[in-house]
Protein backbone atom coordinates (compact mmCIF):
# COMPACT_ATOMS: atom_id res chain seq x y z
CA UNK A 1 0.00 0.00 0.00
CA UNK A 2 1.42 3.34 -1.03
CA UNK A 3 0.50 6.49 0.85
CA UNK A 4 1.00 9.88 -0.72
CA UNK A 5 0.41 13.16 1.10
CA UNK A 6 -0.36 15.64 -1.67
CA UNK A 7 0.54 18.56 0.55
CA UNK A 8 4.11 17.37 -0.04
CA UNK A 9 3.55 17.51 -3.86
CA UNK A 10 4.78 13.93 -4.32
CA UNK A 11 1.78 12.52 -6.17
CA UNK A 12 1.34 12.43 -9.92
CA UNK A 13 -2.44 12.57 -9.33
CA UNK A 14 -3.80 15.92 -8.18
CA UNK A 15 -6.65 15.77 -5.64
CA UNK A 16 -7.94 19.32 -5.29
CA UNK A 17 -8.79 21.10 -2.06
CA UNK A 18 -12.33 21.73 -3.35
CA UNK A 19 -12.76 17.98 -3.92
CA UNK A 20 -11.41 17.27 -0.43
CA UNK A 21 -13.80 19.82 1.08
CA UNK A 22 -16.79 18.18 -0.66
CA UNK A 23 -15.68 14.70 0.41
CA UNK A 24 -15.34 15.91 4.02
CA UNK A 25 -18.85 17.41 3.82
CA UNK A 26 -20.32 14.15 2.48
CA UNK A 27 -18.51 12.07 5.11
CA UNK A 28 -19.91 14.34 7.81
CA UNK A 29 -23.43 13.84 6.38
CA UNK A 30 -22.90 10.06 6.51
CA UNK A 31 -21.75 10.39 10.14
CA UNK A 32 -18.92 7.91 9.56
CA UNK A 33 -15.40 9.27 9.94
CA UNK A 34 -13.94 5.94 8.69
CA UNK A 35 -15.06 6.62 5.12
CA UNK A 36 -12.61 7.39 2.32
CA UNK A 37 -13.30 8.37 -1.29
CA UNK A 38 -12.46 5.58 -3.74
CA UNK A 39 -11.95 6.42 -7.40
CA UNK A 40 -11.90 3.46 -9.76
CA UNK A 41 -11.91 2.68 -13.45
CA UNK A 42 -13.93 -0.17 -14.89
CA UNK A 43 -14.72 -1.39 -18.38
CA UNK A 44 -17.92 0.05 -19.80
CA UNK A 45 -19.55 3.33 -20.59
CA UNK A 46 -19.99 4.71 -24.07
CA UNK A 47 -16.22 5.15 -24.62
CA UNK A 48 -14.80 1.90 -23.23
CA UNK A 49 -13.80 2.80 -19.68
CA UNK A 50 -15.77 4.56 -16.99
CA UNK A 51 -14.93 6.35 -13.78
CA UNK A 52 -16.48 5.30 -10.51
CA UNK A 53 -16.73 7.19 -7.22
CA UNK A 54 -17.70 5.46 -3.98
CA UNK A 55 -17.11 5.63 -0.27
CA UNK A 56 -15.11 2.82 1.27
CA UNK A 57 -14.02 2.05 4.82
CA UNK A 58 -11.58 -0.64 3.73
CA UNK A 59 -8.09 0.12 2.48
CA UNK A 60 -6.71 -2.70 0.32
CA UNK A 61 -3.06 -3.75 0.09
CA UNK A 62 -2.74 -2.52 -3.52
CA UNK A 63 -4.38 0.86 -2.88
CA UNK A 64 -2.55 4.10 -3.32
CA UNK A 65 -3.68 6.52 -0.63
CA UNK A 66 -3.60 10.22 -1.40
CA UNK A 67 -4.17 12.47 1.61
CA UNK A 68 -5.45 15.97 0.93
CA UNK A 69 -5.83 18.63 3.58
CA UNK A 70 -9.14 20.51 3.55
CA UNK A 71 -9.38 24.29 3.26
CA UNK A 72 -9.96 24.64 7.01
CA UNK A 73 -6.33 23.61 7.54
CA UNK A 74 -7.34 21.18 10.27
CA UNK A 75 -8.99 18.19 8.65
CA UNK A 76 -7.96 15.97 5.75
CA UNK A 77 -9.49 13.22 3.64
CA UNK A 78 -8.11 10.14 1.93
CA UNK A 79 -8.48 9.26 -1.73
CA UNK A 80 -8.06 5.54 -2.49
CA UNK A 81 -7.06 4.25 -5.92
CA UNK A 82 -6.46 0.56 -6.69
CA UNK A 83 -3.35 -0.37 -8.68
CA UNK A 84 -5.21 -1.16 -11.93
CA UNK A 85 -7.05 2.18 -11.91
CA UNK A 86 -3.94 4.11 -10.88
CA UNK A 87 -2.14 3.36 -14.14
CA UNK A 88 -4.94 5.04 -16.11
CA UNK A 89 -5.06 8.07 -13.80
CA UNK A 90 -1.37 9.02 -14.07
CA UNK A 91 -1.13 12.85 -14.13
CA UNK A 92 -4.93 13.25 -13.76
CA UNK A 93 -6.70 15.87 -11.68
CA UNK A 94 -9.67 15.00 -9.47
CA UNK A 95 -11.68 18.12 -8.72
CA UNK A 96 -15.09 19.28 -7.55
CA UNK A 97 -16.69 22.11 -9.48
CA UNK A 98 -19.75 24.30 -9.08
CA UNK A 99 -21.20 25.95 -12.16
CA UNK A 100 -24.30 26.83 -14.11
CA UNK A 101 -24.94 23.15 -14.85
CA UNK A 102 -24.71 22.19 -11.18
CA UNK A 103 -22.08 20.66 -8.94
CA UNK A 104 -20.04 17.56 -9.67
CA UNK A 105 -16.79 15.72 -9.24
CA UNK A 106 -14.72 15.82 -12.42
CA UNK A 107 -11.61 14.02 -13.58
CA UNK A 108 -9.32 15.79 -16.01
CA UNK A 109 -7.34 12.91 -17.44
CA UNK A 110 -4.54 13.60 -19.94
CA UNK A 111 -4.40 9.86 -20.71
CA UNK A 112 -7.90 9.87 -22.21
CA UNK A 113 -7.84 10.00 -26.01
CA UNK A 114 -11.60 10.56 -26.22
CA UNK A 115 -14.29 11.27 -23.65
CA UNK A 116 -18.04 11.08 -23.87
CA UNK A 117 -20.28 14.11 -23.45
CA UNK A 118 -21.21 13.20 -19.89
CA UNK A 119 -17.55 13.10 -18.85
CA UNK A 120 -17.89 9.81 -16.99
CA UNK A 121 -16.35 7.54 -19.62
CA UNK A 122 -13.26 7.67 -21.80
CA UNK A 123 -11.06 5.66 -24.14
CA UNK A 124 -7.33 5.29 -24.47
CA UNK A 125 -5.12 4.14 -27.32
CA UNK A 126 -3.86 0.53 -27.14
CA UNK A 127 -0.28 1.80 -27.10
CA UNK A 128 -1.02 3.67 -23.86
CA UNK A 129 -1.85 0.62 -21.77
CA UNK A 130 0.84 0.24 -19.12
From Swiss-Prot:
Q: Which Pfam families has this protein been placed in? A: Fe-S_biosyn (PF01521)
- Cofactor binding, note field: Binds 1 iron-sulfur cluster per subunit.
Please give the InterPro entries that the UniProt record associates with this protein. Answer: FeS_biogenesis, FeS_cluster_insertion, FeS_cluster_insertion_CS, FeS_cluster_insertion_RrpA, HesB-like_dom_sf
Functional note:
Required for insertion of 4Fe-4S clusters for at least IspG.
SUPFAM superfamilies given in the database record: HesB-like domain
Q: Which family does it belong to?
A: Belongs to the HesB/IscA family.
Q: Which cofactor does it need?
A: iron-sulfur cluster
Name listed for the protein in its UniProt record? Iron-sulfur cluster insertion protein ErpA
Keywords, A to Z, come to: Iron, Iron-sulfur, Metal-binding
This protein's encoding gene: erpA
Amino acid sequence: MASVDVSQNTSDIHFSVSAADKVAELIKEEDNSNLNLRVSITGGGCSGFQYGFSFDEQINDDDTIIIQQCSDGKSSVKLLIDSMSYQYLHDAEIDYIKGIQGEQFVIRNPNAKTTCGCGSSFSIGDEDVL
